[in-house]
């Protein structure tokens, strides 16, 4: 089936929802301050409320029912609550064990079910009313490898072994190596602990170099950047581009100059622009309304909630941090395909390029 545009899906989604005079929204998430899950989902819920507040100012009639659905709870006791079956759309759950029951419930009452965060299972393949925002890591890896093959044609790949026993990037680098080998593209592997002269031999002086680490952690990144600085000092004309990981966005505040110097590209399904005027305004508004700052997490949960409200309830494809781009699953629901490369430009500045 041909991919539908994000705006078209959002528009049709909201036309169906707003066919009634009042849109009834349900939220079924752990909404408490007992643990990290509860605090994060409470912040997400608050972001939803801020978005709904803006939509009401635009003339939308929206009511919200929120139910606490903790990890040790029973979804059945929530689903029988007054108002649950009257919802037009429900945001939740957080925990995979509740999905089957909620999906069946929403199917029976013709309710749209937005699953905003990580779950396991293939429910979106079987339920036409599910909108799955979460992207499996395997899909992210495959999409990233495909994008590397397209965007960095002609580059000389250098994979750096960081000796990180805690790394979870082995499956990605293996997939990347297989893609290079299938296409007959030569790549070199070196080790961050190699002597400088040995490390240098892995690089090309005639072609642009694309450096990929087999670790996403900050200490290993720092070691490699130090190694590259030495390499560039001896070879000032050598061209180096680094392709990193989503986790690097957490380190960008302290590495912006290095990211720009090495033309860093990061795959992501969000971009938090701390200096953006609208982002700052929403963060300030959050503090005024709830008397505390958003948690220091990427992506910001409150802004994610706000973006979800504007997309699902207001058919807006403009986003502050968390873009959505859904594709219809044949015989099932909708899966989020939003994918960006965050590019730190050597000339300064950052751009988020959609693919």
Predicted regions: what is each one?
Residues 91-176, 250-252:
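Extracytoplasmic ligand/sensor domains, especially the bilobed periplasmic-binding protein
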Residues 66-72, 117-119, 133-140, 161-172, ...:
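Hinge/beta->alpha junction and helix N-cap segments in small-molecule ligand-binding domains
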Residues 20-81:
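N-terminal extracellular/periplasmic Venus flytrap/periplasmic-binding protein-like
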Residues 72-88, 197-206:
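Short, well-structured alpha-helical segments in soluble
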Residues 292-353:
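Segments of small-molecule ligand-sensing domains
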